[in-house]
Amino acid sequence: QFRAVEQTKTYFEQALKEEPNRIPKFLWNAKMRFGKTFASYQLAKKMGLSRILILTFKPAVESAWREDLVSHIDFEGWQYISNKDARNNNLNIDQEFHRADKSKPIVVFGSFQDLLGTNESGGIKTKNEFIHATNWDLVIFDEYHFGAWKERAKELFEKEDEESAVDFDAEKYKKDEA
């Protein structure tokens, strides 16, 4: 775990230094019982990241992510937000997020099944808008092999890329770079 955290941290720091406008990606091909949830939180802590989004293709893993965060002294004061926890407080996940103390680290857990769902007009569900509007420090794709290559999953992220590119002026870029 220690080596994985150090190697990932070093890679992220070097990648951002070399290409500050490129978002680095790193894959942990970890075996079961490696401790990826705990190691992921350690990585976020070591890097000083405070907005962490965990997206999973297998919602049944939520309890492991929650328990590793709330039960370990290393993450005291960190906040865990999910649909399940929000419902237990009679709230939606977005309400729970807005109530969170923004001066402390926040971990939001969500499933692709929920994120890929749409409202009646085909848009983003109101309760999930904050996920799309937040600038996350770290996004973790968990159980990636369970559905990352499905068309709906690809569409979700392709749409995000298109939306962020809307303000890009190719002519201005060419002129500025000339």
Please describe what each predicted stretch is:
Residues 1-178:
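SF2 helicase/translocase NTPase motor core
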